[in-house]
Structure formats: structure tokens, C-alpha cells
Amino acid sequence: MAKYVTIMDIARELGISKSTVSRALSGDTGNVKAETLQKILATAELMGYHRNELAVNFRQQSTHNIGIIIPEIVTTFYMTFINEAQAILRKQGYKVMIAISNENPEQERENILMMEQLRVDGILMSACDKEHNVDLYNKVIERGIPIVFFDRTVEKVKASQVHMDDYIMSFFMVEALLRKGYKHIIHIPGPAYIRNSYERLRGYRDALEKFHIEYQAQDVLSPALSAEEGSWVMERFLEKNVPFDAVFGFTETAVLGAKSAIQKRGLRIPEDVALCCMSGTALASLVHPQLTVVEQPIEKMAQESCRLLLEHIADGYRRIEEIALRGETVIREST
């Protein structure tokens, strides 16, 4: 096993006090002679000394580490968010630790407790379930670790939250389809345990109501997140031979799966069936036909989430904010 070089080892090598070596290596050099300082620094480098950052941070009550907990990596949204947030936090002197919950509330719970044990200064989090771990969220916050929720937010938690206005953006998307003349729009929702799913479904229903089209429960298919799930759900629906002329999906990956199933049936997009979805990314412009999407303001979401978390780390929860961002509707070939 490798032996870690300690301050005591350097002091013993040079025959000087441990406190002198400690001051020199911590930057407190006011009372250390220049000649002694040079010897200490040279010896430390020669012996392979590395400062124990964990011990230093423990004494300073700060690790300068931020935890980011995400529910999945099926969609490209979270990787884009992490890249943006990490760049922002690094500029402020923070390192980022990432944990994935795999849509499992118990695994999410373990991730939160792990972050707490590692003494992160704060957590950016997208919840995998809107209710399951609310008790733990509140306890961790009460114990002094601020949490800012992004994208998948939760209720009954005294924490700042940043998300897209899912209701209004889904309403606008379905309204755009209806204005184009589509009459029978089916919806591939997200799982019920995600708060965004309810908001997007609500926008879909209210847009239909505005155009005096009766909401039909059978037009809301089984939930899907991945392309595989989207394909499976669409295949099951197509087997029923129910007429429809458009698909509105919870997320891009599920709609790409649905697109594959539709094209395998020989249906043309958009001549026979129009496709659109929420949570669009750059991927939507790389497929043929290109997808009509609502693009989430990921960069802005990361900026606001980081800003709020850094404010909470600096001064506690003086002001809790909920920020609902507008996305951008991008009309492409699929509609």
C-alpha cells in the first residue's frame, strides 16, 4: 500500500517543527524565513507531499463540492444541463459530484445520503418521484445542506425550484397543431410520478377544450420515456386501428421511438401523421423528417439553478424562489 507523506514526515526530514511546516504549506508564511520556506517547499515536492483537502475542508466547514443528482441518462437533457452547470460552478471554485438515481426513489435516497456524508456544500437535484423522498429533502435542508430542484420539481419542500412552464408550453404546442387543422391528437405521457407529466397533460387537455374538442381518455397512451418504450406504446396503439392524425409526446426520445413504429407501418410523416414533443434537443434536427419540438431553456435553467444554490450556500434560505421559464416552440418538417 502506498504511504502518504505527512507534514510530520517533512518536519522530521528537515529537523524543524511540525507547526513551521504546516504554516509554510498552508500559505501562512509571515513568520517563516524565506530560506526555510524554500527548503520546506522543495522537500515537500521531492517527497511527493499532497495536501489533505478533505481534512482542510472539514476544519473550514466547506468542501467546495456540489452534488448533482439526476433521475436518468436516457435523454440528452441531463448531460447538457450537467455540462453547463459544471462550467458555471468551476468558475466559482467548486467541483461537481454526479449521481444517477435510475428512476428509483430508494437509489435516490442513497444518493442524497451519500452526498450528505461527503459533506457537499449544496445539491442540485431533479427528483425521480414527486412525493417519495419529501421527508428526506426537508431533513437534509434543515441539517444545513441547501437543495435547489431543477426540471423535475416537487411540492411540500421549502426549497428553490427552477423548471420550464410545462403547462403553458404544452398548451401552445397542442394549440399550434390544432390551428394547423389536426383534429385527432393522441398523447404519449410521462410517468405519473413525475410532476411535469401532469402539467403537460393538463396543457394538452386545455388546448383541446379551447378548440371544443372532447378529451378522450383512450387518446392518452401508456407512459414512455425511452425510445424503446415509445416504440412499444405506439405499436400497441396502432394495433387497435384507431384513427389519429397527430402525436404529442412527453419527451423527445419517446416520440423518436413512436416515429419508428409509425414508419414501419408505412405511414408518412407528416402527410399521414404529424409528430411533435416536449423536451426537444439538437437530436430533433438530425432525424428525418426533423421533429417539431418545444426546446427547454437548458442553459438558462442551469444558470438560474446555480445562482440560487450559490446564494443559499452564502446566506442560507433568506429568499426561496420558484422560477418558471418559457421554452421555445420550434416548428419543423414533422408537422
Predicted feature descriptions by range:
Residues H184, Y215-D219, R268-A274:
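Short acidic capping loops at alpha-helix termini that bridge into adjacent secondary structure
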Residues P71-T80, I98-Q107, D129, R152, ...:
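Hinge/beta->alpha junction and helix N-cap segments in small-molecule ligand-binding domains
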Residues M1-T63:
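N-terminal helix-turn-helix DNA-binding module of bacterial transcription factors
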Residues M1-A2, T6, N57, Q61-E175, ...:
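Alpha-helical recognition/docking segments in bacterial nutrient-uptake
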Residues A44, L89, A207-L208, L238, ...:
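Conserved hydrophobic residues forming the short capping helix/wall of the S-adenosyl-L-methionine
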Residues E235-T335:
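Flexible loop/turn connectors
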Residues K91-Q92, R143, L208-Y215, E239-P243, ...:
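Short helix-capping segments at alpha-helix termini
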